[in-house]
Design a protein with these regions (language model features):
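Conserved ABC transporter NBD signature motif
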Residues: 48-60, 324-332, 344
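Conserved ABC ATPase signature
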Residues: 135-140, 144, 405-409, 413
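ABC ATPase "signature
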Residues: 218-222, 230, 490-491
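ABC ATPase NBD coupling module
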Residues: 61-78, 96, 104, 225-231, ...
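Helix-to-loop junction immediately C-terminal to a conserved catalytic motif
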Residues: 40, 44, 316
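Conserved ABC ATPase "signature" region
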Residues: 60, 112-131, 383-400, 509-510
Length: 530
């Protein structure tokens, strides 16, 4: 397949049997999404199939008419897209959108369609299907929306489901629920599943077969057991080495070495004391307390709605606590005038989750990084220029990047720019809000290594907000587990992960993909079998 003059998929072949699952694994640009679009005949204008064929139940998809394919696509092939927030129309009720899918069933009445929709919602584990039917997408959680999309995909009882990164934005426990749902539907309905992911841990645990792609070429493929236990390509081994769930000591050895170095006992850099916050009748944070030592990394973990985001907003002064106290350095965050707070805020900077949305696409990198200096009135023009160049160099980017716009940068380069923007103020604390969740695994490794280096060189304190517990275990010194706005457990990360006391923490840890269990012939192999 080529887009214009650029070939993006080269001589890729694989077979997927009835009732089996195959994971296409690769980073951005590997060609995995193009393959999915080819199977579904969703290639954009300008794309050309240079050779080969896609055969589905003996039919060459490229050669059948549009009418034949629409019928095939509506009844025999289902698609679960990556982002349910973008896949569903936000201004139309779920039920209205579900009826568009139900029409392919050619039932006798709208009432019958509604009944089938409600039955399908119940089948995919949505409690109170009637409420879901009446709801708008913004009224449902990410996990609920993903279940809706899965329900719409399986409603016509297709023989193939193509799932494009269906769990990439979900909390670890919701991720497990969604993957378990796929397993159950595959088993009960005899579905074949083409699973597209960059997460080798999920693929190894959940798929019967794996195909590893890079730059549009298959690096290797085979059963999950074979590819995972004895990879033959250097690229697959590199992917394995960079996945925290597969290689538990990928970052931990660096982290422990850093912590054994001599360090002055400087006390706490962040001290959160009995903080509470409500929005109307909703208790967002209730009596939350934790402390972070200078130069250390503290993780906040929990599912959506646990209070992580509200806690961060309180720390940054974007919300005011109803009660309690927050101290950063030697200054209290709450109770200050605006001018006093600006002085505190200079030493407390945020790195956002998604570098594809957190950078203004119309600005050049130099302006993006300089913006905090302009906002706080730091230095003259020459000093600001020098500090921007210093920040760019510190994150490992060449200075010529200053003249580029975000569209000309890769995901990893964009996140480095976001980190440079935070560093330009020379802060004491960085709040890292899921800083690697939108990145491929090898790019994630580069960013984590960069953060370790900066912390060691600059003595930074990190507050790391994440739902990736396998990563938290490796990079954090201490951790606070939040549920429904309350602290359920906290302490040294090794202690919490080794012997969690609270059932909620135990459930979170249990939901981490267990890569020691890989699949062969549809059954899960325990560690002793591999």
């Amino acid at each position: 397949v080529a887009y214009g003059d650029q070939q993006v998929v080269d001589n890729i072949s694989f077979a997927l049997g009835r009732g089996e699952s195959l994971a296409l694994i690769g980073e951005s640009g590997s060609g995995k999404t193009t393959i999915a679009r080819t199977v579904l005949r969703l290639l954009p204008k300008g794309a050309t199939i240079l050779g080969g064929e896609v055969s589905f139940d003996g039919k060459n998809i490229a050669r059948i008419s549009d009418r034949e394919f629409r019928e095939l696509r509506g009844t025999q092939m289902g698609f679960v897209p990556q982002d349910p927030g973008n896949a569903l129309n936000p201004v139309r009720r779920i039920g209205v959108q579900a009826h568009e899918t139900a029409r392919v069933l050619k039932l006798r009445s709208r009432a019958e369609e509604r009944q089938r929709i409600l039955e399908t919602f119940e089948e995919v584990g949505l409690s109170d299907p009637a409420r879901i039917y009446r709801s708008y997408p913004y009224e449902l959680s990410g996990g609920m929306l993903q279940r809706v999309l899965i329900g719409l995909a399986v409603m016509p009882r297709p023989s193939l489901i193509v799932a494009d990164e269906p769990t990439s934005g979900l909390d670890v426990t919701i991720q497990k629920v969604v993957l378990d749902l796929f397993e159950e539907l595959k088993r009960s309905l005899g579905l074949s599943l083409l699973f597209i992911t960059h997460d080798l841990a999920i693929a190894a645990e959940r798929a019967d077969h794996l195909a590893v792609l890079k730059d549009g070429v298959v690096q290797e493929q085979g059963s999950s057991r074979t590819v995972f236990a004895a990879p033959t390509s250097d690229y697959t081994r590199e992917l394995q080495a960079d996945v925290p769930a597969i290689n538990p000591d990928r970052y931990r050895s660096i982290h422990l070495a850093r912590n054994t170095a001599e360090r002055n006992a400087l006390g706490n850099q962040i001290d959160v004391q009995s903080v509470s916050k409500t929005f109307g009748d909703v208790v967002a944070v209730a009596d939350v307390s934790f402390a972070v030592q200078r130069g250390k990394t503290h993780a906040l973990v929990g599912e959506s709605g646990s209070g992580k985001t509200t806690t961060v907003r309180l720390l940054l002064g974007l919300e005011h606590a109803d009660s309690g106290k927050i101290v950063v350095g030697d200054a209290a965050v709450n109770g200050h005038s605006r001018s006093q707070w600006r002085s505190v805020r200079r030493h407390l900077q945020l790195v956002y989750q998604n570098p594809f949305t957190s950078l203004d696409p119309t600005w050049r990198v130099g302006k993006i990084v300089r913006e905090p200096l302009d906002r706080f009135g730091v230095g003259d023009k020459d000093e600001r220029r020098d500090r921007v160049a210093e920040a760019i160099r510190s994150v490992g980017l060449p200075e010529e990047m200053i003249a580029r716009k975000p569209a000309k940068l890769s995901g990893g380069q964009r996140q480095r720019v976001a980190i440079a923007r935070a560093l330009v103020m020379r802060p004491d604390v960085l709040v890292l809000d899921e800083p690697t969740s939108a990145l491929d695994v090898t790019v994630q490794a580069e960013i984590i290594d960069l953060l370790f280096r900066l912390q060691s060189e600059l003595g930074l304190t990190y507050l790391f907000v994440s739902h990736d517990l396998s990563l938290v275990r490796q990079i954090a010194d201490t951790v606070t587990v939040l549920q429904d706005g309350r602290v359920v457990e906290q302490g040294p990360v090794e202690k919490i992960f080794a012997s969690p006391a609270d059932p909620y923490t135990q459930a979170l840890l249990k939901a981490i993909p267990a890569v020691s269990r890989v699949r062969e012939n549809g059954r899960v192999l325990e560690p002793a079998t591999v």
